[in-house]
């Protein structure tokens, strides 16, 4: 985000430090002091860090080897002329904060800003958008390959439980370990899909004419994808496509309402809207049909190095949508004990409109 690039700050979060210098590890502290930056880590990672860090805005992070990351950061801060240091309080434990605050005293003000580093990442550049697009394309391919697999083995196996299917879909997502998951996949059959983030059951088994809700994503060069489809299971013609035909009329009605809500939101979102206004496009459709109480979560969330980033597309979000923001549009209806539908795609604000990624 504009205005944050030259602010002095620190982070121990891996995705935040990767954004700053193109490298991270599980024991490091990234520190920016005015126009200098430092990647502080222990001896296990210093060589790799020196080989991997990349300049950002013309500044290359200096790799500092340390057995005490916080003390090394304190030493550097004290020597600098910095008067204020920003950090995300959600990423720093109380012990670290107290230690910094005690050592810096009145010389340097520690300024906690929730989601500070996510604010810096809220607008994606073209390179990031292309990585997200590739990640989502691989995700879509995994949906297609998994559907083919389920059709193929349905008659061969006596039973396919939710738990088995949820475990198996990971192989299609990761390409047997080539890619990491962006989150634990959600696979829910029939009434279990009425729980938005259902846990897979070993007691529920796939049968013809069941519904399947599948929400999943991978990481491509660390950038996340996220997609949800709800499908009718026909062993002869099973595809995670937008057009679905359910035998039960009530289920078909609910599915069509969610589909209409998502389409209205995607076609209606514009740069300059607030997240609240974007949310209302989808929520309004569902409410007008009388299902508002069953749409129990926000319409969307930003995505990038983290699966959940800014902006939030929710009924409380005052964030102004701008060019380059990437987020999900995922309305849903969840009828407890009966049925659940969610349809999710990623969009980017481009030329003042939302465009499918």
UniProtKB/Swiss-Prot annotation:
Keywords attached to this entry: Aminopeptidase, Cobalt, Hydrolase, Metal-binding, Metalloprotease, Protease
Designated name of the protein: Aminopeptidase HP_1037
Task performed by this protein: Hydrolyzes the N-terminal amino acid residue from a polypeptide chain, with a preference for substrates containing multiple alanine residues.
pH dependence: Optimum pH is 4.0-5.0.
Pfam families associated with the record: Creatinase_N (PF01321), Peptidase_M24 (PF00557)
Molecular function terms from GO: aminopeptidase activity; metal ion binding; metallopeptidase activity
Any one biological process term the GO annotation gives: proteolysis
EC number of this enzyme: 3.4.11.-
Keyword Protein biosynthesis included in the entry's annotation: no
Note on cofactor: Binds 2 cobalt ions per subunit.
Secretion signal span: none
Residues binding Co(2+) 1, per UniProt: 226, 301, 330, 344
PROSITE patterns: PROLINE_PEPTIDASE
Coiled coil, from the record: none
Biophysicochemical property: temperature dependence: Optimum temperature is about 40 degrees Celsius.
Cofactor(s) required, per the database record: Co(2+)
């Amino acid at each position: 985000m504009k205005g944050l690039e030259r602010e002095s700050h620190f982070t121990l979060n891996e995705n935040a430090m990767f954004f700053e210098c193109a490298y991270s590890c599980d024991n490091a502290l990234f520190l920016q002091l005015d126009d200098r930056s430092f990647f502080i880590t222990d001896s296990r990672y210093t060589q790799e860090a020196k080989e991997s860090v990349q300049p950002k805005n013309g500044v290359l992070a200096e790799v500092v080897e340390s057995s005490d990351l916080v003390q090394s950061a304190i030493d550097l801060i004290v020597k600098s002329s910095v008067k204020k240091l920003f950090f995300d309080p959600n990423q720093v434990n109380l012990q670290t904060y107290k230690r910094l605050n005690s050592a810096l005293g009145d010389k340097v003000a520690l300024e906690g800003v929730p989601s500070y580093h996510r604010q810096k990442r809220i607008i994606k550049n073209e390179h990031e958008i292309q990585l997200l697009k590739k990640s989502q394309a691989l995700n879509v391919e995994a949906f297609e390959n998994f559907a083919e697999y389920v059709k193929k083995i349905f008659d061969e196996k006596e039973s396919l439980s939710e738990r088995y299917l949820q475990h198996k879909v990971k192989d299609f997502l990761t390409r047997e370990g080539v890619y990491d998951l962006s989150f634990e996949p959600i696979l829910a059959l029939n009434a279990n899909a009425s729980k938005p983030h259902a846990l897979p059951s070993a007691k529920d088994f796939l049968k013809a004419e069941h519904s399947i809700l599948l929400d999943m994503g991978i990481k491509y060069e660390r950038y996340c994808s996220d997609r949800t489809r709800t499908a009718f299971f026909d062993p002869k013609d099973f595809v995670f496509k937008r057009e679905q035909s359910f035998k039960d009329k009530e289920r078909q009605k609910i599915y069509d309402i969610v589909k209409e809500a998502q389409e209205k939101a995607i076609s209606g979102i514009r740069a300059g809207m607030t997240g609240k206004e974007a949310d209302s496009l989808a929520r309004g459709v569902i409410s007008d049909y009388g299902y508002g109480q069953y749409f129990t979560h926000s319409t969307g969330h930003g995505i990038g190095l983290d699966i959940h980033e800014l902006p939030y597309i929710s009924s409380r979000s005052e964030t102004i949508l701008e060019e380059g923001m990437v987020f999900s549009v995922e309305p849903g209806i969840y009828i407890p004990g009966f049925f659940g539908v969610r349809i999710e795609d990623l969009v980017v604000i481009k030329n003042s409109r939302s465009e499918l990624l």
